[in-house]
C-alpha cells in the first residue's frame, strides 16, 4: 500500500498504465513520457532519450508506410480489437480510451468500436456482427494463440463477418496493445505487417 511505504520513507513509483483508471486517453506520447520518467528515476536520461528516439522513428516509419499504402485503397479497412473468452463466454472490445485506438489509427485502420467511450467493454455477438469489421485483432494473456484465433468461430454470427470470411484475424499477446508500453510499438508493426502490405 502506497501510504504504508510513504510513512516509512520508501518512495513508490506507480505505473499509471497499470492502475485502475489508468491513463484516460493513452497514446504513444505516454509511452515516451514513461520512459523519460524511468530515465530520471534510474539516472539514465540519455539511454531513455535514445530509446524514445528509436521508438519515435519506428512509429514514423510505420505511419509513412501506411500513408503510402493508403493511396492504393478506396477506403481504410475497419478493425475491432477483441479479448474473447476461449471456450465461449464474454467477448470484450477495446474502445476510444484504450491503447488500441491510437495503435489502429497509426496502422491506418478504422476502429469499429471507436464510439465506445470506455477503455474496454463487453460486446454482444449481434453488436460485433452489426459492425462487420474487415480485420479482427484478438488479444490473449496466455495459452495457444491459434486457440484464441479459433475461438472467434465460437461466437454466434461471426461466420458472416468480413474479417472471418476473408481470414483477416490476428492473435496477439495482450501486452502488444495494452497498456501503453514500448511493446505497443511492436504490436503496431505486427498489425501493419499483417494487414497493410
Describe every region a protein language model picked out.
Residues 20-25, 36-50, 87-93, 174-181:
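Second-shell loop/turn segments in exported
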Residues 116-125:
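Short helix-initiation/N-cap motifs at beta->coil->alpha
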Residues 2-41, 161-162, 170-171:
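Flexible loop/hinge segments that line or gate small-molecule binding clefts
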Residues 107-117:
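A local structural motif
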Residues 17-20, 117-118, 141-143:
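Short, acidic/turn-prone active-site loops that include or flank metal/cofactor-
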Residues 47-107:
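Basic- and aromatic-lined ligand-binding clefts that recognize polyanionic substrates
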Amino acid at each position: 500500500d502506497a501510504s504504508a511505504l510513504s510513512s516509512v520513507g520508501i518512495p513508490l513509483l506507480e505505473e499509471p498504465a497499470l492502475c485502475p483508471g489508468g491513463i484516460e486517453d493513452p497514446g504513444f506520447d505516454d509511452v515516451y513520457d514513461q520512459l523519460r520518467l524511468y530515465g530520471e528515476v534510474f539516472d539514465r536520461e540519455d539511454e531513455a532519450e535514445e530509446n524514445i528516439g528509436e521508438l519515435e522513428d519506428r512509429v514514423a516509419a510505420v505511419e509513412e508506410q501506411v500513408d503510402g499504402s493508403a493511396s492504393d485503397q478506396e477506403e481504410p479497412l475497419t478493425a475491432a480489437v477483441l479479448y474473447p473468452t476461449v471456450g465461449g463466454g464474454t467477448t470484450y472490445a477495446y474502445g476510444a480510451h484504450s491503447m488500441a485506438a491510437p495503435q489502429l489509427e497509426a496502422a491506418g485502420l478504422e476502429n469499429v468500436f471507436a464510439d465506445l467511450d470506455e477503455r474496454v467493454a463487453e460486446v454482444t455477438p449481434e453488436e460485433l456482427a452489426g459492425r462487420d469489421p474487415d480485420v479482427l485483432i484478438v488479444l490473449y494473456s496466455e495459452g495457444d494463440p491459434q486457440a484464441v484465433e479459433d475461438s472467434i468461430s465460437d461466437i454466434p454470427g461471426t461466420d458472416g463477418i468480413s474479417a472471418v470470411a476473408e481470414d483477416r484475424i490476428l492473435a496477439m499477446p495482450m501486452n502488444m496493445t495494452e497498456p501503453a508500453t514500448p511493446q505497443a510499438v511492436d504490436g503496431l508493426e505486427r498489425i501493419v505487417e499483417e494487414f497493410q502490405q
